[in-house]
Design a protein with these regions (language model features):
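Extreme N-terminal starter segment of soluble prokaryotic enzymes
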Residues: 3-9
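Conserved N-proximal alpha/beta basic substrate-recognition cap immediately N-terminal to
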Residues: 5, 16-143
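Redox-cofactor binding/interface segments in oxidoreductases and associated redox assembly factors
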Residues: 10, 88-89, 198
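Extended, domain-scale alpha-helical bundle/helix-rich regions
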Residues: 12-14
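Flexible, glycine/charged-enriched surface loops at secondary-structure junctions
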Residues: 42, 264-269
């Protein structure tokens, strides 16, 4: 493989796990193909370091927009990742040691090829913990593993939600009110360790807004509306995406976050 020929390597979960209706990885791959790039796809378990090179046993894949089977595997090849044009880190959490190890390996070649997002920053800015930088712009929020702290938080705000610090996609979100017993919360903490707790905002039933930021520029937004009877708006949990526009306040907040993301070399957010 020639150095920096038009190749995009995608580090992701199993190809079969891609949801063609909701997964932006597919859209990125299709656009790369339209621009003449070959696509190689691999999972973190395929990463290998030998001397100073990082290899991945990768599938050369062609993606399709309108076919029943949205991809075909053309070839299986061990590639030197430093010779690709771009590497897209697209695997979902959990933010575990496998995830972290992959960032260390990719960091070794980050000066030889463009990795999106930067593996050092991905490791040091996990999504929910990164929000600590913007607590003044958020509903009341705490991070804790203490049942007593959660009870105090619940007493103050009546209705709260808790979610795993390193979770994603609206999974394992728990609504808590005065009738939620300690045993249930303790069991949750035992399973998920440190959690993020927030004051519950009733207006979530009308939806939230997902803002897309590329290179520090706000590119668009959607409103995600929960299923009837749900408080979780994530599309992967049954939420529906509709067109929206940002209010002046939302735009002001988004610009603050976008500026910080650009400073920290987070290209896609």
């Amino acid at each position: 493989m020639k150095r920096h020929s038009k190749i995009v390597a995608i580090q992701g979960d199993s190809l079969n796990s891609i949801n063609r209706k909701t997964d932006t990885t597919l859209l990125l791959a299709l656009e790369a193909q339209r621009r003449g790039y070959k696509i190689y796809y691999y999972e973190t378990k395929s990463l290998t370091l030998v001397k100073d090179k990082i290899y991945a046993l990768s599938k050369e894949v062609e993606f399709y927009e309108n076919k029943k089977n949205f991809y075909s595997i053309k070839n299986l090849k061990k590639i030197d990742l430093s010779k690709t044009t771009f590497i897209l880190m697209r695997q979902n959490p959990p933010f575990n040691m496998d995830y972290i190890t992959a960032t260390f390996l990719l960091e070794k070649i980050s000066k030889k090829t463009r990795i999106v997002n930067d593996p050092f920053m991905v490791r040091n800015m996990p999504e929910k913990l990164y929000s600590i930088e913007f607590l003044k712009l958020m509903p009341p929020t705490i991070f804790t593993r203490s049942i007593d702290e959660i009870e105090k938080f619940k007493k103050k705000y009546k209705n709260i939600v808790i979610k795993p610090t390193h979770g994603y996609g609206g999974k394992n979100i728990l609504f808590i009110n005065k009738s939620t017993n300690k045993k249930k919360i303790s069991k949750y903490l035992k399973k998920h360790n440190h959690i993020m707790a927030q004051k519950f905002l009733p207006q979530i039933k009308l939806g939230d807004k997902r803002i897309f930021i590329i290179g520090g520029i706000i590119k668009g937004a959607i409103r995600r509306i929960p299923m009837k009877g749900s408080i979780v708006s994530n599309i992967g949990q049954g939420g529906k995406a509709v067109k929206t526009i940002l209010t002046k306040r939302e735009l002001r907040i988004a610009k603050i976050v976008a500026s910080d993301l650009k400073k920290n070399q987070i290209v896609f957010a």
